[in-house]
Amino acid sequence: MISGGYMDLYAMAEYLVNNYGYIGIFIISFTEAFIQPIPPDVFIIGASFFGLNPIISAIVATIGTTLGGLFGYFLGDKLGHPIFIKLFGEKYLHKGEEFFNKYGVYGVVIAGFSPLPYKVIAWLSGIFEMHKLLFTVGTIIGRLPRFLAVAYFGDVLGNINRLSDINIYLFYLINSHYNYIFDAIMPIISKTAYPLIAITSLIIFIKNRKFGMKLIFALFLAFMIAFSLKYLVNEPRPYLVLDNVHLLCNEGNEPSFPSGHTTLAFTLATSLLFYSKKLGILFLSWAIIVAYSRVYVGVHYPLDVLAGMIIGIFCGCLTRIDIYKLIDNI
Protein backbone atom coordinates (compact mmCIF):
# COMPACT_ATOMS: atom_id res chain seq x y z
CA MET A 1 0.00 0.00 0.00
CA ILE A 2 2.70 2.46 1.08
CA SER A 3 4.99 1.34 -1.72
CA GLY A 4 2.18 1.74 -4.25
CA GLY A 5 1.35 5.20 -2.92
CA TYR A 6 4.99 6.23 -3.17
CA MET A 7 5.21 5.02 -6.76
CA ASP A 8 2.04 6.94 -7.62
CA LEU A 9 3.60 10.09 -6.19
CA TYR A 10 6.80 9.44 -8.12
CA ALA A 11 4.84 8.95 -11.36
CA MET A 12 3.03 12.23 -10.71
CA ALA A 13 6.33 14.00 -10.03
CA GLU A 14 7.82 12.59 -13.23
CA TYR A 15 4.75 13.77 -15.15
CA LEU A 16 5.19 17.28 -13.74
CA VAL A 17 8.85 17.50 -14.76
CA ASN A 18 8.27 15.89 -18.15
CA ASN A 19 5.42 18.25 -19.04
CA TYR A 20 6.20 21.44 -17.14
CA GLY A 21 10.00 21.39 -16.85
CA TYR A 22 11.39 23.81 -14.28
CA ILE A 23 7.91 24.52 -12.92
CA GLY A 24 7.57 20.81 -12.18
CA ILE A 25 10.90 20.78 -10.33
CA PHE A 26 9.80 23.84 -8.37
CA ILE A 27 6.52 22.19 -7.33
CA ILE A 28 8.29 18.98 -6.26
CA SER A 29 10.91 20.92 -4.28
CA PHE A 30 8.31 23.17 -2.67
CA THR A 31 6.03 20.35 -1.51
CA GLU A 32 8.87 18.02 -0.46
CA ALA A 33 10.05 20.68 1.97
CA PHE A 34 6.97 20.35 4.16
CA ILE A 35 4.88 17.25 3.36
CA GLN A 36 5.50 14.85 0.44
CA PRO A 37 8.37 12.29 0.38
CA ILE A 38 9.72 12.60 -3.19
CA PRO A 39 12.95 14.66 -3.21
CA PRO A 40 13.90 16.68 -6.31
CA ASP A 41 17.41 15.19 -6.46
CA VAL A 42 16.59 12.42 -8.92
CA PHE A 43 15.06 14.92 -11.36
CA ILE A 44 18.07 17.23 -11.06
CA ILE A 45 20.37 14.31 -11.87
CA GLY A 46 18.19 13.43 -14.86
CA ALA A 47 17.63 17.04 -15.93
CA SER A 48 19.36 16.51 -19.28
CA PHE A 49 17.03 13.60 -20.01
CA PHE A 50 14.08 15.99 -19.60
CA GLY A 51 15.74 18.63 -21.79
CA LEU A 52 16.62 20.84 -18.80
CA ASN A 53 19.85 22.44 -17.64
CA PRO A 54 21.11 20.69 -14.45
CA ILE A 55 22.49 23.90 -12.88
CA ILE A 56 19.29 25.86 -13.52
CA SER A 57 17.33 22.89 -12.15
CA ALA A 58 19.45 22.99 -8.97
CA ILE A 59 18.82 26.72 -8.52
CA VAL A 60 15.08 26.32 -9.13
CA ALA A 61 15.00 23.44 -6.63
CA THR A 62 16.80 25.58 -4.05
CA ILE A 63 14.26 28.39 -4.48
CA GLY A 64 11.40 25.91 -4.27
CA THR A 65 12.70 24.12 -1.19
CA THR A 66 13.46 27.43 0.57
CA LEU A 67 9.93 28.74 0.01
CA GLY A 68 8.47 25.32 0.85
CA GLY A 69 10.56 25.21 4.01
CA LEU A 70 9.22 28.63 5.03
CA PHE A 71 5.70 27.32 4.45
CA GLY A 72 6.50 24.32 6.66
CA TYR A 73 7.90 26.77 9.23
CA PHE A 74 4.60 28.70 9.07
CA LEU A 75 2.58 25.48 9.52
CA GLY A 76 4.67 24.48 12.52
CA ASP A 77 4.31 27.93 14.04
CA LYS A 78 0.53 28.12 13.54
CA LEU A 79 -0.59 24.50 13.95
CA GLY A 80 1.89 23.54 16.66
CA HIS A 81 2.59 20.26 18.43
CA PRO A 82 -0.72 18.35 17.95
CA ILE A 83 -0.76 18.40 14.14
CA PHE A 84 2.98 17.71 13.96
CA ILE A 85 2.59 14.63 16.15
CA LYS A 86 -0.27 13.35 13.98
CA LEU A 87 1.79 13.78 10.80
CA PHE A 88 5.25 12.69 11.93
CA GLY A 89 4.85 11.06 15.34
CA GLU A 90 5.76 12.08 18.89
CA LYS A 91 9.20 10.46 18.53
CA TYR A 92 10.30 13.11 16.04
CA LEU A 93 9.08 15.90 18.28
CA HIS A 94 11.30 14.82 21.18
CA LYS A 95 14.29 13.97 18.98
CA GLY A 96 13.86 17.22 17.09
CA GLU A 97 13.79 19.24 20.30
CA GLU A 98 17.02 17.56 21.41
CA PHE A 99 18.52 18.22 17.98
CA PHE A 100 17.58 21.92 18.03
CA ASN A 101 18.81 22.46 21.57
CA LYS A 102 22.18 21.03 20.59
CA TYR A 103 22.72 22.42 17.08
CA GLY A 104 20.33 25.34 16.51
CA VAL A 105 20.61 26.73 12.98
CA TYR A 106 23.40 24.25 12.21
CA GLY A 107 20.72 21.57 12.47
CA VAL A 108 18.90 23.21 9.55
CA VAL A 109 22.11 23.15 7.50
CA ILE A 110 22.73 19.49 8.38
CA ALA A 111 19.17 18.48 7.51
CA GLY A 112 19.29 20.49 4.29
CA PHE A 113 22.44 18.80 3.05
CA SER A 114 22.06 15.30 4.47
CA PRO A 115 19.43 12.52 4.20
CA LEU A 116 17.81 13.74 7.44
CA PRO A 117 14.09 14.56 6.90
CA TYR A 118 14.23 18.29 6.12
CA LYS A 119 10.45 18.67 6.25
CA VAL A 120 10.51 17.64 9.91
CA ILE A 121 13.15 20.28 10.63
CA ALA A 122 11.10 22.92 8.78
CA TRP A 123 8.04 22.24 10.94
CA LEU A 124 10.09 22.10 14.13
CA SER A 125 11.79 25.40 13.29
CA GLY A 126 8.36 27.02 13.39
CA ILE A 127 7.28 25.14 16.51
CA PHE A 128 10.41 26.15 18.43
CA GLU A 129 10.32 29.69 16.98
CA MET A 130 13.71 29.81 15.29
CA HIS A 131 14.42 33.22 13.76
CA LYS A 132 13.03 33.17 10.20
CA LEU A 133 16.14 34.73 8.68
CA LEU A 134 18.43 32.17 10.35
CA PHE A 135 16.17 29.37 9.15
CA THR A 136 16.18 30.72 5.58
CA VAL A 137 19.95 31.18 5.48
CA GLY A 138 20.50 27.72 7.00
CA THR A 139 18.23 26.19 4.37
CA ILE A 140 20.07 27.83 1.48
CA ILE A 141 23.51 26.92 2.89
CA GLY A 142 22.41 23.30 3.25
CA ARG A 143 20.33 22.82 0.12
CA LEU A 144 22.15 24.79 -2.58
CA PRO A 145 25.50 22.90 -2.32
CA ARG A 146 23.62 19.61 -2.20
CA PHE A 147 21.58 20.34 -5.31
CA LEU A 148 24.60 21.74 -7.16
CA ALA A 149 26.57 18.59 -6.30
CA VAL A 150 23.69 16.47 -7.57
CA ALA A 151 23.52 18.59 -10.74
CA TYR A 152 27.25 18.13 -11.30
CA PHE A 153 26.89 14.38 -10.82
CA GLY A 154 24.08 14.34 -13.36
CA ASP A 155 26.21 16.30 -15.82
CA VAL A 156 29.04 13.82 -15.28
CA LEU A 157 26.73 10.90 -16.03
CA GLY A 158 25.59 12.65 -19.18
CA ASN A 159 29.19 13.02 -20.34
CA ILE A 160 30.57 9.71 -19.13
CA ASN A 161 32.85 9.14 -22.13
CA ARG A 162 34.52 12.54 -21.74
CA LEU A 163 34.89 11.93 -18.01
CA SER A 164 36.50 8.55 -18.63
CA ASP A 165 39.07 10.15 -20.95
CA ILE A 166 39.92 12.78 -18.31
CA ASN A 167 40.18 10.09 -15.63
CA ILE A 168 42.65 8.06 -17.70
CA TYR A 169 44.65 11.17 -18.63
CA LEU A 170 45.00 12.18 -14.96
CA PHE A 171 45.94 8.61 -14.02
CA TYR A 172 48.84 8.59 -16.48
CA LEU A 173 49.80 12.13 -15.46
CA ILE A 174 50.41 10.89 -11.90
CA ASN A 175 51.44 7.28 -12.49
CA SER A 176 53.93 7.90 -15.29
CA HIS A 177 55.86 10.64 -13.46
CA TYR A 178 57.79 8.48 -11.03
CA ASN A 179 61.21 8.52 -9.40
CA TYR A 180 63.20 6.16 -7.20
CA ILE A 181 62.44 8.10 -3.98
CA PHE A 182 58.66 7.96 -4.44
CA ASP A 183 58.96 4.37 -5.67
CA ALA A 184 60.37 3.51 -2.24
CA ILE A 185 58.04 5.67 -0.12
CA MET A 186 54.61 5.44 -1.78
CA PRO A 187 54.13 1.65 -1.48
CA ILE A 188 54.95 1.88 2.24
CA ILE A 189 52.43 4.69 2.77
CA SER A 190 49.83 2.76 0.81
CA LYS A 191 50.35 -0.59 2.55
CA THR A 192 50.51 0.81 6.10
CA ALA A 193 47.30 2.86 5.80
CA TYR A 194 44.95 0.18 7.16
CA PRO A 195 47.19 -0.78 10.13
CA LEU A 196 47.63 2.89 11.04
CA ILE A 197 43.87 3.47 10.88
CA ALA A 198 43.24 0.46 13.14
CA ILE A 199 45.92 1.41 15.69
CA THR A 200 44.84 5.06 15.82
CA SER A 201 41.18 4.10 16.26
CA LEU A 202 42.09 1.74 19.11
CA ILE A 203 44.12 4.43 20.88
CA ILE A 204 41.28 6.96 20.52
CA PHE A 205 38.79 4.39 21.84
CA ILE A 206 40.95 3.69 24.91
CA LYS A 207 41.40 7.41 25.66
CA ASN A 208 37.82 8.52 24.92
CA ARG A 209 35.31 5.69 24.69
CA LYS A 210 32.36 7.86 23.64
CA PHE A 211 34.20 9.50 20.75
CA GLY A 212 35.88 6.18 19.96
CA MET A 213 32.47 4.57 19.45
CA LYS A 214 31.46 7.38 17.10
CA LEU A 215 34.71 6.93 15.18
CA ILE A 216 34.21 3.18 14.86
CA PHE A 217 30.63 3.76 13.68
CA ALA A 218 31.85 6.25 11.05
CA LEU A 219 34.60 3.90 9.84
CA PHE A 220 32.19 0.97 9.65
CA LEU A 221 29.65 3.01 7.69
CA ALA A 222 32.37 4.27 5.32
CA PHE A 223 33.62 0.73 4.79
CA MET A 224 30.12 -0.57 4.01
CA ILE A 225 29.43 2.24 1.54
CA ALA A 226 32.77 1.78 -0.22
CA PHE A 227 32.49 -2.02 -0.25
CA SER A 228 28.95 -1.90 -1.66
CA LEU A 229 29.92 0.60 -4.36
CA LYS A 230 32.91 -1.50 -5.40
CA TYR A 231 30.74 -4.43 -6.42
CA LEU A 232 27.87 -2.28 -7.65
CA VAL A 233 30.06 -0.26 -10.05
CA ASN A 234 32.51 -3.14 -10.61
CA GLU A 235 35.19 -0.95 -12.21
CA PRO A 236 38.34 -2.98 -13.05
CA ARG A 237 41.72 -1.87 -11.71
CA PRO A 238 43.69 0.36 -14.12
CA TYR A 239 46.53 -2.16 -14.44
CA LEU A 240 44.03 -4.74 -15.72
CA VAL A 241 42.82 -2.62 -18.65
CA LEU A 242 45.52 -0.02 -19.41
CA ASP A 243 48.94 -0.38 -20.98
CA ASN A 244 52.25 0.84 -19.55
CA VAL A 245 51.07 1.13 -15.95
CA HIS A 246 53.87 1.72 -13.43
CA LEU A 247 52.65 -0.93 -10.97
CA LEU A 248 54.18 -1.05 -7.48
CA CYS A 249 51.34 -2.86 -5.67
CA ASN A 250 48.88 -5.50 -6.79
CA GLU A 251 45.30 -5.72 -5.54
CA GLY A 252 44.33 -8.70 -7.66
CA ASN A 253 40.95 -8.56 -9.38
CA GLU A 254 39.15 -6.60 -6.65
CA PRO A 255 37.07 -3.75 -8.15
CA SER A 256 38.62 -0.30 -8.21
CA PHE A 257 35.87 2.25 -7.47
CA PRO A 258 35.99 3.78 -4.90
CA SER A 259 39.34 3.60 -3.11
CA GLY A 260 38.84 1.87 0.23
CA HIS A 261 42.16 3.13 1.61
CA THR A 262 41.27 6.72 0.75
CA THR A 263 37.73 6.36 2.10
CA LEU A 264 38.85 5.16 5.53
CA ALA A 265 41.83 7.53 5.68
CA PHE A 266 39.58 10.55 5.12
CA THR A 267 36.95 9.20 7.51
CA LEU A 268 39.60 8.99 10.22
CA ALA A 269 41.14 12.38 9.39
CA THR A 270 37.78 14.19 9.25
CA SER A 271 36.67 12.57 12.51
CA LEU A 272 39.89 13.60 14.25
CA LEU A 273 39.30 17.24 13.27
CA PHE A 274 36.40 17.15 15.76
CA TYR A 275 38.56 15.47 18.40
CA SER A 276 41.78 17.50 18.14
CA LYS A 277 42.28 20.17 15.48
CA LYS A 278 46.07 19.74 15.36
CA LEU A 279 45.81 15.96 15.19
CA GLY A 280 43.07 16.24 12.56
CA ILE A 281 45.17 18.50 10.33
CA LEU A 282 48.12 16.13 10.67
CA PHE A 283 46.02 13.13 9.66
CA LEU A 284 44.30 15.09 6.89
CA SER A 285 47.72 15.74 5.36
CA TRP A 286 48.49 12.04 5.69
CA ALA A 287 45.14 11.10 4.09
CA ILE A 288 45.90 13.28 1.05
CA ILE A 289 49.26 11.52 0.64
CA VAL A 290 47.52 8.13 0.95
CA ALA A 291 45.09 9.15 -1.80
CA TYR A 292 47.96 10.23 -4.06
CA SER A 293 49.88 7.03 -3.31
CA ARG A 294 46.99 4.84 -4.48
CA VAL A 295 47.19 6.38 -7.95
CA TYR A 296 50.99 6.54 -7.94
CA VAL A 297 51.38 2.80 -7.23
CA GLY A 298 48.96 2.03 -10.08
CA VAL A 299 45.98 0.52 -8.27
CA HIS A 300 43.41 3.34 -8.54
CA TYR A 301 42.14 6.03 -10.89
CA PRO A 302 41.92 9.65 -9.66
CA LEU A 303 38.11 9.41 -9.58
CA ASP A 304 38.39 6.38 -7.29
CA VAL A 305 40.26 8.40 -4.69
CA LEU A 306 38.05 11.47 -5.21
CA ALA A 307 34.98 9.36 -4.45
CA GLY A 308 36.79 7.94 -1.42
CA MET A 309 37.51 11.48 -0.18
CA ILE A 310 33.84 12.48 -0.49
CA ILE A 311 32.56 9.36 1.27
CA GLY A 312 35.21 9.67 3.97
CA ILE A 313 34.51 13.35 4.68
CA PHE A 314 30.77 12.68 4.83
CA CYS A 315 31.12 9.73 7.22
CA GLY A 316 33.72 11.56 9.30
CA CYS A 317 31.32 14.47 9.80
CA LEU A 318 28.87 12.06 11.41
CA THR A 319 31.14 11.92 14.48
CA ARG A 320 30.11 15.54 15.09
CA ILE A 321 26.53 14.52 15.82
CA ASP A 322 24.82 11.62 17.55
CA ILE A 323 23.22 10.68 14.27
CA TYR A 324 22.48 7.08 15.24
CA LYS A 325 20.34 8.39 18.13
CA LEU A 326 18.57 11.07 16.13
CA ILE A 327 17.37 9.15 13.07
CA ASP A 328 16.22 5.90 14.61
CA ASN A 329 14.17 3.86 12.13
CA ILE A 330 14.51 6.38 9.29
From Swiss-Prot:
MF GO annotations: sphingosine-1-phosphate phosphatase activity
Signal peptide coordinates: none
Gene3D superfamilies referenced in this protein's UniProt entry, alphabetically: Phosphatidic acid phosphatase type 2/haloperoxidase
SUPFAM superfamilies tied to this protein: Acid phosphatase/Vanadium-dependent haloperoxidase
SMART domains: acidPPc
Name of the protein in question: Uncharacterized protein MJ0374
Organism: Methanocaldococcus jannaschii (strain ATCC 43067 / DSM 2661 / JAL-1 / JCM 10045 / NBRC 100440) (Methanococcus jannaschii)
Taxonomic classification: Archaea, Methanobacteriati, Methanobacteriota, Methanomada group, Methanococci
